[in-house]
């Protein structure tokens, strides 16, 4: 494979030879002089530090010994796949700091014994507990959404009333600059506080959280992503961001919030609060937590948009790595409970206890399908709007990509991140004030349709229409663009608003604040969509079908689809949020067109940020041009193996060694020197840590020093924060003891032959949610180990198949 000639890190500093040397410990190959470097099988240069050739001899407790054909290790052989030799950007890196989650149960003796003890009644009890947890997730997610909505409404109302009174007073007496300073200062103060708690307390709470949850459901362990502290900072941060007037929405973070709630409730304890409620202990493993997090994400979507079916489809389309019929029912149940809880509580809050008219945080309002019909000749127009949405979405993502690269390189300190967020808040308020001040688009005031009408230089009984878009929460601005009657907006007002808000939203996404991109995208699209509808109405002579509100809806769908590239779930979400199936087909056409056009230029926003964070994310399928690659070409070698009965000192050394960077170790039979050591099972680092902590040694067991036999509960109690090996004290005498791994290892790990193609390996690994896949030869000897990073290194780029470089950062 090709060597990578340049190592790029976020610090922008290359590794020189002296720095790269310790990362590789190359064993000499037979026939290669001792001082000569052996070639790399896996194609990564010194910076990758992941593959070294096979040693000539089997060293139990250290390296696998199976040699490969000499021709495969020939340094003079041309690489069969010409990969690029220059890696210029961060998205060409794959970070080694991310670990994988265990979405495959280790079927060792302890696990099988416990499963055999579960009778029909116990099994039914476990199933009932699953439904109870999903109900609790739905209720709590709905309550959190209510809390966010009520607090935002109160604080935003207080801020806008204060600024409005100030503007009205100074409009008469002069001195509107004081109003500008007040507005900018209030926005900056809220955002300063919101950014500070995110940057200094829990950085993973930044953004919408959707990319992080996608990675979690994909099988990547993102530190702190589902902790209680993250939830508290997320909720507080999104309130402060929205009240601070940023071009953000509170709907996206609800997905992250629901996921954190699900992850916490399903474990029956809080490691942050150090409280164990001794319930739901059976679900303390990654496989169970993954399913509940899927339900939490769906409940978040349901609470945000009042779209329970859309929530289920969102979990399916955007994240879930495992799916079945029973899981679908539970996720749908959690989504329905979430939207009902939100509906019920908000109805009581608004004084309509039995009305149940608030199904989500945002309600797009019901479109009158009798008057706002669409005709067959509008379908090409909708497709054209999808093309525009795809192009604008690609421009948005491209600008945000370069902005994110700049932030990674130069705005990586928390204090600088807070300063940038505060600056954006002040600039947003200033831009809004200047546009409102400059606008002369005055419209007659219609009852209470406008929440905070600004008169400024308009006549009595009129309001400034530019203020409706800026001087309001983004959710209410979207509804205004959808439902305000024709003639409510001047085309110049909509054009200026679209242009300014587009760049403000692009600048805002990626700040160190808790915020989402759903509502800003809808608002941008609704603005240019309404402008499109006004133009069409003018051209057609105010035809009945050319309603600006209808085209505002299509523009909103096109813009959001062009940015995030979701089709199935977004179609249903928009249908449920508008309470109308009539526009289902046009919305689907618009979203599909926007995705197809946008994908021609650049990835979707969430996938782009996942790549920029160098996360080893596995897509649904392997790269289409990767069939010529085999398992032996992508696997990690050499492999650290352990014997069934291994010395404690060897295990401690293996776990302490930085060279043993895998979290799974093949277990081989005790070789007597005459027979090759064959694969017997696989044991995880976390299991070895628990065994060492409880000192499960053969000698102690034979002397009766073990108080009891280790149970599966002991491993669940240590989950998920297993102690580091440095915290476990092992005396010199204990190092000479022996540990029997037979009872704790997985005796039937998944294996593949070394000739298996990459797509076949990828399909097995991805479909089963594996963390380790052992590569064996015809004699069942360990040849290598395939991990998530080995598969994620290969992807289809513009010039064909690309191989990413591995980095420690």
Curated annotation (Swiss-Prot):
Slowly voltage-gated channel mediating the exchange of chloride ions against protons. Functions as antiporter and contributes to the acidification of the lysosome lumen and may be involved in maintaining lysosomal pH. The CLC channel family contains both chloride channels and proton-coupled anion transporters that exchange chloride or another anion for protons. The presence of conserved gating glutamate residues is typical for family members that function as antiporters. It comes from Bos taurus (Bovine). SMART domains: CBS (SM00116). Residues 1-130, 602-809 are cytoplasmic. The chain crosses the membrane at residues 131-163, 178-201, 227-245, 251-268, 326-345, 379-409, 414-436, 491-511, 516-539, 583-601. InterPro entries: CBS_dom, CBS_dom_sf, CIC-7, Cl-channel/antiporter, Cl-channel_core, ClC. Belongs to the chloride channel (TC 2.A.49) family. ClC-7/CLCN7 subfamily. A motif (Selectivity filter part_2) lies at residues 249-253. Coiled coil: none annotated. This is H(+)/Cl(-) exchange transporter 7. GO terms for cellular component: intracellular membrane-bounded organelle; lysosomal membrane. A motif (Selectivity filter part_1) lies at residues 207-211. The record marks 251 as: Mediates proton transfer from the outer aqueous phase to the interior of the protein. Chloride binds at residues 208, 518, 606. The keyword Ion transport applies. It is a multi-pass membrane protein. Residues 210-217, 292-304, 308-316, 549-563, 564-566, 567-578, 579-582 dip into the membrane without crossing it. CDD domains: CBS_pair_voltage-gated_CLC_euk_bac, ClC_6_like.
């Amino acid at each position: 494979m090709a060597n990578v000639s340049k190592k790029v890190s976020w610090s922008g500093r290359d590794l020189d030879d002296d720095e790269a040397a310790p990362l590789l410990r190359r064993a000499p190959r037979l026939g290669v002089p001792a001082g000569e470097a052996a070639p790399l099988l896996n194609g990564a240069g010194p910076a990758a530090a992941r593959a070294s050739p096979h040693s000539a001899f089997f060293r139990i407790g250290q390296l696998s010994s199976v040699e490969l054909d000499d021709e495969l290790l020939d340094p003079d052989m041309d690489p069969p796949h010409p990969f690029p030799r220059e890696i210029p950007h961060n998205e060409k890196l794959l970070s080694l700091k991310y670990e994988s989650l265990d979405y495959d149960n280790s079927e060792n003796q302890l696990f099988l014994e416990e499963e055999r003890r579960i009778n029909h009644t116990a099994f039914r009890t476990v199933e009932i507990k699953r439904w109870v947890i999903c109900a609790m997730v739905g209720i709590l997610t709905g309550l959190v959404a209510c809390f966010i909505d009520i607090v935002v409404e109160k604080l935003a109302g207080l801020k806008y009333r204060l600024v409005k009174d100030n503007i009205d007073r100074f409009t008469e007496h002069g001195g509107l600059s004081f109003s500008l300073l007040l507005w900018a200062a209030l926005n900056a103060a809220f955002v300063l506080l919101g950014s500070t708690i995110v940057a200094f307390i829990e950085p993973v709470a930044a953004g919408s959280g959707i990319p992080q949850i996608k990675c979690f459901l994909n099988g990547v362990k993102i530190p702190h992503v589902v902790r209680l502290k993250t939830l508290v900072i997320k909720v507080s941060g999104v309130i402060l961001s929205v009240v601070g007037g940023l071009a953000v929405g509170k709907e996206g973070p609800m997905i992250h919030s629901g996921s954190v709630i699900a992850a916490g409730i399903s474990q029956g304890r809080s490691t942050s609060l150090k409280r164990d409620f001794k319930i739901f202990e059976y679900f303390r493993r990654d496989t169970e937590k993954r399913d509940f997090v899927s339900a939490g994400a769906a409940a978040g979507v349901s609470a945000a948009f009042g779209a329970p079916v859309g929530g289920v489809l969102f979990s399916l389309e955007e994240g879930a790595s495992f799916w079945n019929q029973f899981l679908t029912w539970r996720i749908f149940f959690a989504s329905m409970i979430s939207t009902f809880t939100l509906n019920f509580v908000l109805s009581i809050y608004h004084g309509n206890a039995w009305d149940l008219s608030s199904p989500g945080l945002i309600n797009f309002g019901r479109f009158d399908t009798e008057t706002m019909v669409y005709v067959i000749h509008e379908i090409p127009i909708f497709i054209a709007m999808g093309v525009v949405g795809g192009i604008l979405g690609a421009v948005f993502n491209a600008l945000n990509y370069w902005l994110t690269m700049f932030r990674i390189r130069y705005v990586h300190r928390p204090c600088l991140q807070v300063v940038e967020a505060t600056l954006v808040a002040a600039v947003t308020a200033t831009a809004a004030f200047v546009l409102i001040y400059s606008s002369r688009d005055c419209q007659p005031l219609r009852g209470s349709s406008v929440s905070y009408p600004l008169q400024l230089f308009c006549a009595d009984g009129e309001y400034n229409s530019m203020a409706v878009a800026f001087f309001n929460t983004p959710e209410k601005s979207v509804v205004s663009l959808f439902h305000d009657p024709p003639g409510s907006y001047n085309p110049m007002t909509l054009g200026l608003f679209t242009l300014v808000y587009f760049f403000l939203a692009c600048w805002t996404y990626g700040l160190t604040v808790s915020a989402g991109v759903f509502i800003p995208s809808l608002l941008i699209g609704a603005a240019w969509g309404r402008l499109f509808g006004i133009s069409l109405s003018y051209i057609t002579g105010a035809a009945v079908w050319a309603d600006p509100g209808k085209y505002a809806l299509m523009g909103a769908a096109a813009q959001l689809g062009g940015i995030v590239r979701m089709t199935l779930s977004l179609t249903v979400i928009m249908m449920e949020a508008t309470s109308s199936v009539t526009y289902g087909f046009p919305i689907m056409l618009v979203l599909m067109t926007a995705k197809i056009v946008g994908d021609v230029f650049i990835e979707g926003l969430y996938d782009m940020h996942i790549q920029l964070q160098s996360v080893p994310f596995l897509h649904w399928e392997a790269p289409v041009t990767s069939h010529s690659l085999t398992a032996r070409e992508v696997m990690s070698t050499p492999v650290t193996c352990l014997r069934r009965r291994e010395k404690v000192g060897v295990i401690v050394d293996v776990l302490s060694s930085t060279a043993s960077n895998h979290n799974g170790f093949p277990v081989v039979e005790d070789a007597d020197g005459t027979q090759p050591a064959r694969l017997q099972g696989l044991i995880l680092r976390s299991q070895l840590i628990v065994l060492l902590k409880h000192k499960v040694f053969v000698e102690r067991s034979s002397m009766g020093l073990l108080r009891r036999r280790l149970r599966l509960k002991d491993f669940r109690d240590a989950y998920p924060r297993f102690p580091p090996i440095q915290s476990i004290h092992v005396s010199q005498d204990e190092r000479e003891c022996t540990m029997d791994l037979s009872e704790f290892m997985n005796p039937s790990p998944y294996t593949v032959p070394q000739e298996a193609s990459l797509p076949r390996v990828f399909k097995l690994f991805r479909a089963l949610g594996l963390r380790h896949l052992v590569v064996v030869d015809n004699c069942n000897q360990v040849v290598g180990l395939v991990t998530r990073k080995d598969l994620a290194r290969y992807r289809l780029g513009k010039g064909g198949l690309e191989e990413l470089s591995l980095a420690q950062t």
